[in-house]
Design a protein with these regions (language model features):
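Low-complexity, proline/glycine- and charge-rich juxtamembrane/linker segments of membrane proteins
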Residues: 1-10, 37, 48, 67, ...
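Soluble C-terminal extramembrane regulatory/interaction domains of multi-pass membrane proteins
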Residues: 25, 41-163
Length: 163
């Protein structure tokens, strides 16, 4: 359950980021001397919502995996491998953002993961299906973090095979 507590701790971080973004916009509006920073501030503002959504989906995944473990419900093995690949792509995306770059270079790997997610094994176990749905939403959110329009990001994730 420590993982769930860690996941919930991101709420405060998102609130701080949202406040910083709002403050940055306020400073831009009141000081023409800061206009040279407007692109960076606007990029930060545009990141807040999809980042918040991605973190919320991460919490759902963590919670449903914890429930599945508690109830001894099977989660397909392929999900663990897939989540490891998604974690790697997410780390790379975070590296781009830390380097103050838009993570456009991560769009193709995320799109590939979105396509692959439509082919993952299906199961009648609710927790597994919630994990799959949340991971697919998370990929769309990460595509939006990378700079893609949110509706376009959603379109990059094909329907689940056989669904």
């Amino acid at each position: 359950m420590d993982t769930l507590a860690d996941a919930r701790s991101t709420d405060a971080l998102i609130a701080e980021l949202r406040a910083a973004a709002d403050e940055g916009l306020s400073v831009l509006a009141s000081s023409p001397f800061r206009w040279r920073h407007r692109d960076g501030v606007r990029r930060m503002v545009d990141l807040v919502e999809p980042l918040d959504f991605a973190l919320r989906n991460t919490r759902v995944v963590a919670r449903r995996v914890a429930v599945a473990c508690y109830r001894h419900e099977p989660i397909p093995q392929g999900y663990a491998v897939f989540l490891r690949d998604l974690a790697g792509a997410t780390d790379a995306l975070a590296g781009e953002l830390r380097a103050n770059r838009m993570a456009v270079s991560m769009q193709e790997p995320l799109i590939a993961l979105g396509r692959h997610s439509s082919e993952l094994e299906r199961t009648a176990v609710l927790s597994a299906e919630v994990v799959l749905a949340s991971v697919r939403s998370m990929i769309a959110d990460l595509l939006a973090v990378s700079g893609m329009d949110p509706l376009e990001a959603t379109d990059q994730i094909p329907p689940i095979a056989g669904g």
